[in-house]
Design a protein with these regions (language model features):
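Structural and coupling elements of P-loop NTPases
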Residues: 1-534
Length: 534
């Protein structure tokens, strides 16, 4: 059935596309599953409490993920909640994440930052936060695990502001913590919501709501907690930043919520506030202008490629974020980088291994299409009567490096095919020393688990056994101005190595940050970057 422009506009207005970022074990996967639970997308939230839990989280599906109880790949999940169509971009939250995690943030219109209430701001959160800042997208904070002993909430807010450099505005406030976690106070409705923990966190919880200053609240949470709450309200109203939505949309101010994803304390309250505050699909820059999401013509970009999601399928899926207009199954589009028109058949939306064929989708949605090997990260697709390119997705600096070669030299062809395909998906980056061939390469990854993923996939999907020799380098920099400097004549340190990527762009490897600074000092005019351009 054809739709009017007004109907398409209404569909787009109701889209919300966001990523959830966190340090390992801060509760990101649990929060994601509770969102899906409230949206009716799953009936029972899969507990990820223990690494050896028999039930695996909904978003874990690769063999290596099942063995470890972690989420190696970044999945996209869609559900509906109170009139909103929500796309969650799930990012790996375990000890070793990949460049995929960074790239997923390129498809998000906002981010939810999950922080462990007992630990505060941690290393991986800082890295992911920097990418959100680079994109100027709104960042909402959920301080989790208040069902356990947690740090002082004022102290946590100070740490967010000092370490991350973003101002905060608490939207709700915790009443107690640990066994004495009574509920949350909403600073804008002036209501206290108390909770009864659900068994195993599996079902929606019953809630009660009271005016903060009434005797009903005091009788439920106790005199001491009630007095503390009244003092906190007075202090927050006088000292905290006001909720200025212009500052929120620019990424200068983060609304903060407290709760416990495991026991559902504060989760639905957070979800409701967040959906009202966060943006519908945002415009996106092209090389020549900007594409408005409400433009009737379809456009999208590829931000992730996943091969062999299911051995029964032996397939490769390109995930794309729709930027504007309406998508219809079977429509013909321009694949700009490929230089030809293609037909997008059997588009899918995913819930882990479960695939659903979609007939239509709108700006803000994430769809997966079968990739016969023609797509690369950052590719633009647009209506057949259009031709433009979205700004490329940057290549992020790996932090771990290894020399990789095949054991059986007769399998060189399979080795080259395998590493190239895995690199094209964006799981690894391939580098070479100058004057060497592909029989021995240097692989760079953002998280060391990707080395395990690489050897596992080469063995299982390409029947190639490899020897992997880890290298001591931790820093890599692209030479930004190779036309102005002779890379071979750069005055380096004893630990510096000159390499190139598959596009012959020159790069430098270093063991420590001191060497990076020293090389810049010794070579006036040399420009180095942590990001490569695609």
């Amino acid at each position: 059935m054809s739709q009017t422009n007004d109907q398409i506009t209404e569909q787009i207005k109701n889209r919300r596309t966001f990523a959830i970022i966190s340090h390992p074990d801060a509760g990101k996967t649990t929060l994601t599953e509770k969102f899906l639970l409230y949206g009716g997308a799953i009936n029972l939230a899969g507990t990820v409490k223990g690494r050896k839990a028999a039930k695996h989280a909904v978003s874990d599906w690769m063999e290596i993920e099942k063995e470890r109880g972690i989420s190696v790949t970044s999945s996209a999940m869609q559900f509906n909640y109170e009139g909103f169509f929500i796309n969650i971009l799930d990012t790996p939250g375990h000890q070793d994440f990949s460049e995929d995690t960074y790239r997923t943030l390129m498809a998000a219109d906002s981010a939810v930052m999950v922080i462990d209430g007992s630990k505060g701001v941690e290393a991986q959160t800082i890295k992911l936060f920097k990418v959100c800042v680079m994109r100027h997208i709104p960042i909402f904070t959920f301080i989790n695990k208040f069902d356990r002993e947690a740090r002082d909430p004022y102290e946590l807010l100070d740490e967010i502001e000092e370490v991350l450099g973003i101002r905060t505005c608490p939207v709700n406030w915790p009443i107690g913590c640990g066994k004495n976690f009574k509920g949350v106070y909403d600073r804008f409705t002036k209501k206290v919501t108390t909770f009864t923990a659900a068994q195993g966190g599996a079902k929606e919880v019953a809630t009660q709501e009271f005016d903060a200053e009434t005797n009903d609240v005091e009788s439920i949470i106790g005199f001491q907690y009630h007095q503390q709450l009244l003092d906190d309200i007075e202090l927050l109203d006088g000292a905290s930043d006001e909720l200025d939505m212009d500052r929120v949309q620019k990424g200068d101010l983060s609304p903060v919520f407290f709760g416990s994803a495991l026991t559902n304390f504060g989760v639905e309250t957070f979800l409701e506030h967040f959906l009202k505050m966060t943006t519908p699909p945002l415009p996106r820059k092209t090389l020549t202008g900007v594409v408005d999401p409400f433009n009737k013509d379809f456009s999208a970009f590829v931000f992730k490629i996943q091969a062999n999601m299911n051995k029964a399928h032996r397939d490769r899926i390109a995930f794309m974020r729709i930027v504007s207009g309406k998508f219809e199954a079977g429509m013909e589009v321009n694949h700009v980088q490929g230089g030809k028109k293609i037909r997008l058949t059997q588009p899918q939306q995913l819930m882990a291994q479960d695939r659903k064929i979609v007939e239509e989708a709108y700006a803000g949605d994430i769809i997966g299409v079968f990739d016969p090997g023609i797509f690369s990260i950052g590719d633009t697709l647009c209506a057949s009567n259009e031709k433009f390119e979205f700004e490329g997705i940057p290549t992020f600096a790996p932090e771990h490096f290894a020399r990789v070669r095949q054991v059986d030299t007769m399998k060189r062809k399979q080795f080259i095919k395998g590493v190239n395909q895995i690199a094209q998906e964006g799981a690894i980056q391939i580098f070479q020393e100058f004057n060497t061939g592909m029989e021995e390469i240097i692989v760079g990854v953002v998280g060391v688990l990707q080395f395990e993923v690489l050897t596992y996939r080469l063995q299982n999907e390409y029947n190639v056994e490899v020897i992997l020799e880890k290298l001591p380098y931790e820093y890599i920099r692209w030479v930004e101005n190779p036309q102005e400097v002779d890379v071979a004549r750069i005055q380096g340190t004893s630990d510096m190595k000159r390499i190139k990527d598959l596009k012959d762009n020159p790069l430098l490897l270093f063991i420590n940050s001191w060497s990076v600074g020293m090389v810049l000092e010794r070579n006036p005019g040399l420009k180095l970057s942590e990001f490569g351009n695609n």
